[in-house]
Amino acid sequence: MSQLMYEYRDFVASRMKPMGTPREDLLHMTLGVAVEAGELVDAIKKHWVYGKPLDVGNVVEELGDLLFYIQGVLNIVTSQGVLAPKTLEDLTVANMNKLSKRYPTGYSDQAAIARADKD
């Protein structure tokens, strides 16, 4: 795995606000995901609904903030001894594996309905 991803994991850990308990930390970081996702949606909405130029800088900033909070959730989950991806790179590999089962040759509506990755 990439050294950068391990550095980012530790970077996020050093910048997360401790809330008291792992449960409270998890809620804080999960709410951060929701808030940043909402800010990303707002940036896209302004472009799509109101016809404003897409603020690419803002979109990139919100995506970065999402990465921070997602890594924070990973940090908390893995600190609980749960077998889970430890870095965003691990998460990316797990997601690619899941979606490769669902869409072996690429996206199709038929494959989406069949959901080969679900029993």
Predicted region positions:
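Flexible "arm" and connector segments at domain edges
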Residues: 1-119
